[in-house]
C-alpha cells in the first residue's frame, strides 16, 4: 500500500511537471513575436533585443519594481511619507502610496534568485514573470481535481484553467501585470483551505491555514 502511494505521488509530480512545461511553453512563444516577418522583427524589439512589453501597464509595473529595488519604496520620491511618482501625470506626478506591491515583491525575489546563477536584467526577469507565475496554477488545479476524479479528469481541468483564453492572453511572456495572480493565488487559497479543514493533525491544519491566508 505504501509503495502504491509513493508511485501515485511520483506519477502526479511527473504529470504536473509536464503540464507546467506545456502551459509555460505556450506562453513563452510570445517572445518569438510569431506572425511578424523576420525582416521587420527588429522594429518590435528594444535596444537590448528584448520584445517590447505588450501594454503600457507593464512598463508602469516595471518602473515601480525598479523604484522598490533602488530605494525601497514605490515612486521617485516621498511626499508626506507616501510614494510619489513624478513620471505619471507629468509634471505634477501622482501618489502611488496605494500601489499593490505583490508584483514588485515577487519580481524582485525572482530577480535575486535568477542572478545567483546568471546575469539577467530586471527587465528580462519581468518579461518572463507573468508566464512563470501563471503557469503555477497547474499545481492546485491538478491536485484538487485529481482527488475528486482521476488523472484524466485532473489533466483536462488543468488545461482548461491554465489555458483559458482570457487568462493566457493576459499572462503570456511580455505581459507584466497583476493578472498573473488572478487565478493562481485564489486556486492555492482553495487548495490550502481544503487541506486545513481535512487534515487530521493540528500542526498541519495551522500550516495550511497560514498558507491559505498568505494566498488571499
Residue ranges and their predicted role:
Residues 1-45, 56, 155:
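Start-transfer (signal-anchor) and selected internal transmembrane alpha helices
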Residues 1-13, 28, 101, 105, ...:
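Membrane-embedded, hydrophobic transmembrane alpha-helices
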Residues 15-27, 110, 142, 188-192:
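Hydrophobic core segments of alpha-helical transmembrane domains in multi-pass membrane transport
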Residues 32-64, 70-71, 82:
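Low-complexity, proline/glycine-enriched hydrophobic segments characteristic of transmembrane helices
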Residues 60-68, 77, 82-118:
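Short hydrophobic/aromatic helix or loop-helix immediately within or flanking a transmembrane segment
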Residues 68-73, 113-114, 136, 143:
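Sec/Tat-exported extracytoplasmic proteins
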Residues 79-84, 128-147, 152-216:
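Membrane-embedded helix bundles of polyisoprenyl
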Residues 90-105, 115-136, 172-180:
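Loop-to-helix entry region of an early transmembrane alpha helix in multi-pass inner-membrane enzymes
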